[in-house]
Amino acid sequence: MDTTKNNDEFDISYFLTCSIFGFILWILTEQILKYYNKTNKNNKYNLPKGPSFLKWFINYLFNFYDLKLSNNKEEDNNNNNNKSNNSLSQEELIEDTSENTVLKWFNQLNSDNYSVSFFGRPMIFTRDTTISKYILSSNNIDNYTKPPDSSGVLIRLAQNSILMSEGDQWRYHRSIINQPFSSKNVKLMIPTIITTINKLINHLNNNNNNNNNNNNNNNNNNNNNNNNNNNNNNNNNNNNNNNNNNNNNNNNNNNNNNTIIIDIHSYCTKLTFDIIGKLSIGYDFNSIESSDNDNDNNDDDDISKQFDFILNEMIRPIRRFSSYLPLYNDIKLFKFLNELESIIKGAINSRSLITDNNNNKTYKKNFLLDNLLDDNVKEKDIIGNINTFLLAGHETSANLLTFIFYLLSTHNNVQNDLYNHLIENQKKKINKDNKFTEEDEDYQSIEFLDWVIYETLRLFPPAPMIGRTSKNDDILKSGNNNNNNNNNISIPSETLILISVYAIHRDPKLWKDPNIFNPYRWKNIENINNRSDFIPFSSGGRVCVGQKFSIVEARIIISKLILNFELSFNNLKSKPFKIYQRATLTPKYPVFLNFKKRENK
């Protein structure tokens, strides 16, 4: 019995029912607001123009479910010949999904701001850096708070944490979370990161060797089978069988080139999840080792895939009705959340016993949990913050690494330049015995490596949208013309403001050739951490507490993999490269890359 199909049909029926109910409610609400607006009570507000809610929502819904083909705009490449040779590739990186959702209304309205009325509540989308800087500033932490969780998933996952708290409660959580992510502690995390990435490299090498051995055995078996078949088949059939077998072997693994084909997003997700588990609660989820059995394993038993399911649930449109109607996926969702909570509680209990007898002669590997236990934080707050760390720490890092390796695989000149910089850095660290040790590696001294990371963060920011809710009436001063009051935006309290980091990073007014992957542009960019046009980790008082860790982790993983493997994009196996937005920006389909072992390794 195909239960998957039945489940999908059941879910769609719920969706249609809720959509009809929501549409009727929306019509009634709009009629009430139409009458209310006649009293002129809202005339004092000067909201930017935008599409109707129905038009906006249908556009979002169709793109979410891929119910229509995307319409790519033909980009003008007449000036490509005038661009720097360091641009490497003139391929525009405007993805289908982003062009039809994130960037669509900014482009159509030719404006940095537009508004949508969501059941009478104004939503303002902005890529205005002056407005975003104002809203995210430390002075406005209490005036502009995070919007409520409409899906109900985050409330269950991280209610008592730095992610969902506000005011004094947020300041309390921030104070206890800051210490584990200090520069000193992040440096102490490096050995765990190196150990885990080495485990992945060994895993890939072993898979490559095993595939080579299996293919050799298959070839021998095929030869034997062909000899037996000679009695019954003609020579042409035997030759066809040989060709088919050889083609299958070549598709699975290019033995002559020591190449293995992997879904890079899947591997990066498992890698970062194992790293986060070890650093946060001292728990090895062993996701990397389970990669061999992906086809045999039930997704319900894979903790990294459980988190993937949870993240997908957060952005499903039907989730907005979960407070009123039970959903079929609630059973699986709450099961996964309970299992994760049990793991964390077990880690808390076991770690409490260990830390009671800790002689403090060695650094603590479980940086987050140890710090929370030392500060006598309540168990529910520990669970909330650990969940936040697991969620944000592995998902954003995995997506960033996936985008980096994808871009490197499609821009060979950048990949070669990066490899040469890494080799040159190693030569500088060779010791007296003419040997290089990992302890000698300085992951902060490779400037070009940081350029690659920054450029990827610009094109694919982990958090593509930052939401804030105004607590009071306010006036937002537009950066286009601050001296013209007509361009300012008057907003009522409870206005939802969505800052499009993705659109800011792709704004042609701020970035030259914004859709071109060009790491060399960062050579002349200064004061990177204080720019209003580059905010991949947000900005102001609620800037991402783990950004230092994220950059250090990326430096190590990229360096290790590029030094060991040459990457290329597998056009035959991969679907078109598309992105979609859930809590983070993530690839829509698996991204298959060829990992060719370098000859000097």
Curated annotation (Swiss-Prot):
Question: Where does this protein chiefly localize?
Answer: membrane
- Residue positions binding heme: 544
Q: What is its EC number?
A: 1.14.-.-
Query: What GO MF annotations does this protein's record show?
Result: heme binding; iron ion binding; monooxygenase activity; oxidoreductase activity, acting on paired donors, with incorporation or reduction of molecular oxygen
Q: Where is this region: Disordered?
A: 205-253
What cofactor(s) does the depicted protein rely on?
heme
- List residues traversing the bilayer: 12-32
Q: Where, per UniProt, does this protein localize?
A: Membrane
GO CC terms of this entry? membrane
UniProt-listed PROSITE patterns: CYTOCHROME_P450
Note the Pfam families from the entry. Answer: p450 (PF00067)
What InterPro entries does the annotation carry?
Cyt_P450, Cyt_P450_CS, Cyt_P450_E_grp-I, Cyt_P450_sf, Insect_CytP450_Detox
Question: Which class of enzymes does this protein belong to?
Answer: oxidoreductase
What does the record say about its membrane topology?
Single-pass membrane protein
Q: Which UniProt keywords apply?
A: Heme, Iron, Membrane, Metal-binding, Monooxygenase, Oxidoreductase, Transmembrane, Transmembrane helix
Give the similarity note.
Belongs to the cytochrome P450 family.
State the name under which the record lists this protein: Probable cytochrome P450 525A1
Q: Gene encoding this chain?
A: cyp525A1
